[in-house]
Amino acid sequence: DDTEKARKAVEKVKEGGTLLKGKIKTATLLKAVLNKEWGLRTGKIISDVFVFEDRREKEPKLVLMSDGGVNIRPDVNTLVAIINNAVEVAHQLGIETPKVALLAAVETINPDTEETINAGIISKMNQRKQITGCIIDGPLALDNAISEFAVQKKGITSPVAGKADILIVPDIAAGNIFGKALTYYANYPVGHVLVGTKAPVIISSRADKSDVKLNCIALSIKNSKN
């Protein structure tokens, strides 16, 4: 059955190579990958890092987004790990000091909205050098994170607003929807890879086209520390 196939695939990839999901359900494969006895855990939080080519300007740029694949509704500690994983990938892609936007519906902290509170905490942690290797700001609405026009119109002062390299979503639903919107509406080149595992793991959608799977493979190779 699929559960046994997933276990065998996990055991096999420990010998070398990359684990690429085929027609098996994502939940089934992730359960094997995350198994505490024989899975691919390293002790780090595992997260999915999505990379796309932003083509809105004359010169396209790579932008990362996380986590739309593993962590359902991360708390502050998990969000910090997700950020560190994404920053690690950004460094591998040549982005020396990535600008990280913590996304929410608004750019102000609302005591009734958990994601804005978490964003405020994490932004302060970055200012106090508790999170390094990047510049973090949030909460930021999506337009404020990626559009300098929106930033100017709203009068926002931020080292990240309008030029984010990494977008951190508050939960898996937001990330999954955002990723699929880029793929199906914008038709942007995309790819993604799991970070925090003993071996590279690619959780591609069963509906992904061959070019997306190729991008995922290239990304996993680039992010490999072998």
Summary of predicted features, one role per range:
Residues 1-160, 164-226:
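Anion-binding alpha/beta catalytic cores of soluble intermediary-metabolism enzymes, centered on
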